[in-house]
């Protein structure tokens, strides 16, 4: 029988529910259990694909092309599994599905209501996640905060699941906050007590409470919370601020959280062997070298917009005993006059993905600087497109070269719409999304990175390199080192006369793992370290 664990949050958002869920998933996986994990987001958007990164942070793309919440990135990195479209569910998706069924007449003329129709649809998404992956344990994180109007149908659905399949098969974990008041010099449990009271009023009694805190939680305080919240004192788990996210699973294990879960769910698996994970955390805490990478983007004020990129850089650094420091450079501020001042003190330059024209010219200036000064460069998605445009402008002399996305009237559309995108009107869910093959050219940096003739990477784009300019650019030293298997679509480009200048149309950051860095990121960071040492 599949077991179900539900993770809710209270008091404030951004408490780290996702990290808690991912860490528990890692512990259960290391006990030999097949774990899958999903995130329920209460917003009415069908997915975050058209949402601003300022609103939502990064959009994480799965193998099967779902545009999802950034928490799925944490899940994949911690548990080391590839998730699918069933791993992220929104209110918009639920209502869309129910309304389509109503139009097809599947409700036999009945009145369609939140209970049972919406809640049944939510429950079906929970159970489907288990069925599709043949999971022993399904962990479901409920986005938002208990008390939000938007979350109510989800909370009612997960309440019903305990009645449907029995208490031994369901567990509720509530993440909350114990604030520290500096003026009073005290930590306060009252917000947590009220949050649990709110949750219990909805019919859900948490089995474990995970408390986020800046300061250590005393045993007296745990006993007090246990008394008022009606749980075992051992089930009050402290989630103190950690020096690295990857230390969280070890902290939870030290407090026997995974054993409490297994005892409740009647799982008799052996304790998790976290030897390799401990070695990883020790390595992360004792890196002996440093390198500095300039990340030139337009959402740099909100670092969550590039969270997978930053994690992929860190993972690559771990391989070389190196702490990768990211210098955040706002692309809108970069000019030919100040580019050296802004990126000259870094060892490598990275231009990540994005949409729209804001900050584009600054990114192109940064790319030109990397090309002319032999600085290691990695371009991702839009970064690859702009690297192509920069080369066309400044090496081929094609003045005004651009992308038709940025300037529809450009005389040289180096980047243009994919043919199948010409007549697409809807923005949501219509990009080239998900896993596609890429054929690599031998004796290139890309091939050396992967050491494979064909690789599969995740994509999220609408525009593509225009093959009309391919031969001319190739003749000038622009290498097309990765293409679709039929050779039609350009996937990776690099420079002939440069130590390491590689740009990819796909998003390599999405598949990086802390113990298995993505090959392009690994070689980019290695080239940056070499560049630093040669100065």
Swiss-Prot record:
UTP binds at residues 13, 188-193, 224. L-glutamine binds at residues 54, 354, 382-385, 405, 462. The active site is at residues 381, 507, 509. CTPSs have evolved a hybrid strategy for distinguishing between UTP and CTP. The overlapping regions of the product feedback inhibitory and substrate sites recognize a common feature in both compounds, the triphosphate moiety. To differentiate isosteric substrate and product pyrimidine rings, an additional pocket far from the expected kinase/ligase catalytic site, specifically recognizes the cytosine and ribose portions of the product inhibitor. The gene is pyrG. Pathway: Pyrimidine metabolism; CTP biosynthesis via de novo pathway; CTP from UDP: step 2/2. It is an enzyme of class 6 (ligase). Mg(2+) binds at residues 71, 141. Keywords: ATP-binding, Glutamine amidotransferase, Ligase, Magnesium, Metal-binding, Nucleotide-binding, Pyrimidine biosynthesis. SUPFAM superfamilies: Class I glutamine amidotransferase-like, P-loop containing nucleoside triphosphate hydrolases. GO terms for molecular function: ATP binding; CTP synthase activity; glutaminase activity; identical protein binding; metal ion binding. This is CTP synthase. GO terms for cellular component: cytosol. The keyword Nucleus does not apply. Homotetramer. Residues 1-267 are annotated as: Amidoligase domain. InterPro entries: Class_I_gatase-like, CTP_synthase, CTP_synthase_N, GATASE, GATase1_CTP_Synthase, P-loop_NTPase. It comes from the Bacteria. Its EC number is 6.3.4.2. It catalyses: UTP + L-glutamine + ATP + H2O = CTP + L-glutamate + ADP + phosphate + 2 H(+); L-glutamine + H2O = L-glutamate + NH4(+); UTP + NH4(+) + ATP = CTP + ADP + phosphate + 2 H(+). HAMAP family: PyrG (MF_01227). The lineage of its organism: Bacteria, Bacillati, Bacillota, Bacilli, Bacillales. GO terms for biological process: 'de novo' CTP biosynthetic process; pyrimidine nucleobase biosynthetic process. Allosterically activated by GTP, when glutamine is the substrate; GTP has no effect on the reaction when ammonia is the substrate. The allosteric effector GTP functions by stabilizing the protein conformation that binds the tetrahedral intermediate(s) formed during glutamine hydrolysis. Inhibited by the product CTP, via allosteric rather than competitive inhibition.
């Amino acid at each position: 029988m599949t077991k179900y664990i539900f993770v809710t949050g209270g008091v404030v958002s951004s408490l780290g529910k996702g990290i808690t869920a991912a860490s528990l998933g890692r512990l259960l996986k290391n006990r030999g259990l097949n774990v899958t994990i999903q995130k329920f987001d209460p917003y009415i958007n069908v997915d975050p694909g058209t949402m601003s990164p300022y609103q939502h942070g990064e959009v994480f793309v799965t193998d099967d092309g779902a545009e999802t919440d950034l928490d799925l990135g944490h899940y994949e990195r911690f548990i080391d599994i590839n998730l699918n479209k069933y791993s992220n569910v929104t209110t918009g998706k639920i209502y869309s599905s129910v309304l389509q069924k109503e139009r097809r007449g599947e409700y036999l003329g009945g009145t369609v209501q939140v209970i049972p129709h919406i809640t049944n649809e939510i429950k079906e998404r929970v159970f489907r996640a288990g069925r599709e992956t043949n999971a022993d344990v399904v962990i479901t994180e409920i986005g938002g905060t208990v008390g939000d109007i938007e979350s109510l149908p989800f909370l009612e659905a997960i309440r019903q699941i305990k009645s449907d399949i029995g208490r031994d098969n369901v567990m509720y974990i509530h993440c909350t906050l114990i604030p520290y008041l500096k003026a009073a010099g005290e930590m306060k449990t009252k917000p947590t007590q009220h949050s649990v009271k709110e949750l219990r009023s909805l019919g859900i009694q948490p089995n474990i409470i995970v408390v986020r805190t800046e300061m250590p939680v005393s045993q007296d305080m745990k006993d007090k919370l246990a008394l008022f919240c009606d749980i075992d004192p051992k089930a009050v788990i402290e989630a103190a601020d950690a020096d690295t996210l990857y230390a969280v699973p070890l902290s939870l294990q030290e407090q026997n959280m995974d054993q409490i879960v297994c005892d409740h769910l009647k799982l008799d698996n052996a304790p998790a062997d976290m030897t390799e994970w401990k070695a990883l955390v020790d390595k992360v805490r004792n890196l002996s070298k440093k390198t500095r990478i300039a990340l030139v983007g337009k959402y740099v004020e909100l670092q969550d917009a590039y969270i997978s990129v930053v994690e992929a850089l860190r993972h690559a650094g771990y391989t070389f005993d190196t702490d990768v420091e990211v210098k955040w450079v706002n692309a809108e501020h970069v000019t030919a006059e100040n580019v050296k001042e802004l990126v000259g003190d870094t060892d490598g330059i990275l231009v990540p993905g994005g949409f729209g024209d804001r900050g584009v010219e600054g990114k192109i200036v940064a790319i030109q600087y990397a090309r002319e000064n032999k600085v290691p460069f990695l371009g991702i998605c839009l970064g690859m497109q702009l690297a192509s445009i920069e080369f066309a402008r400044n090496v081929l002399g094609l003045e005004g070269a651009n992308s038709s996305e940025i300037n529809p009237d450009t005389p040289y559309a180096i980047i243009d719409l994919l043919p199948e995108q010409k007549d697409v009107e809807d923005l949501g869910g219509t990009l080239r999304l998900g896993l596609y093959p890429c054929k690599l050219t031998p004796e290139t940096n890309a091939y050396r990175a992967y050491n494979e003739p064909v690789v599969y990477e995740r994509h999220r784009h609408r525009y593509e390199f225009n093959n009309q300019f391919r031969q001319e650019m190739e003749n000038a030293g622009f290498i097309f080192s990765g293409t679709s298997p039929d050779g039609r679509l350009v996937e990776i480009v690099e420079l002939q006369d440069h130590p390491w200048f590689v740009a990819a149309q796909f998003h390599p950051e999405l598949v990086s793992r802390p113990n298995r860095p993505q090959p392009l990121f690994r070689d980019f960071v290695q080239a940056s370290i070499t560049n630093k040492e040669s100065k």
